[in-house]
Amino acid sequence: MKKGTILQNIAVFVDVQNIYYTTRDTYQRQFNYRLLWQELMAQSDIVLANAYAIQRSDDQQHKFQKALKHIGFNVKLKPYIQRSDGSAKGDWDVGITIDVMAAAANKNINTIVLLSGDGDFDLLLRHIKAEYGVKTIVYGVPNLTANSLINAADEYHEILQSLLL
């Protein structure tokens, strides 16, 4: 945690699958979590940082999750479920929602930062702003972030090439 003048006490929530696929589909590159962390720490105190990912028995995934932990994220994993019809399931929306609501209720946190383009979170952001008065910031890939989510946030930051590896 950063010492000195703190502009915001923030909680960061990363929908890892959403960020992975939207940056890959738009830029064919990966998101730079370390750079994001540095940018956020320059202007705030990170009280909580959760990254929500899918647990797969893959060496690259294990290295990635270890890197996230090294940066400072709590990595929350859910099993990867392959259905008989070939589709896959690994949705963290409810888990993210529960954790965001708990953080918003925490008097030590005044800003919620969400990395996702998923429009399902728009109601969540509207609710926590109305109920707890927290500031909400969304990071998402342009054209792949739901307008309803952008409109629900106090601030929207486009994930551009400068935030990629």
Residue ranges and their predicted role:
Residues 57-165:
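Nuclease catalytic cores that cleave nucleic-acid phosphodiester bonds
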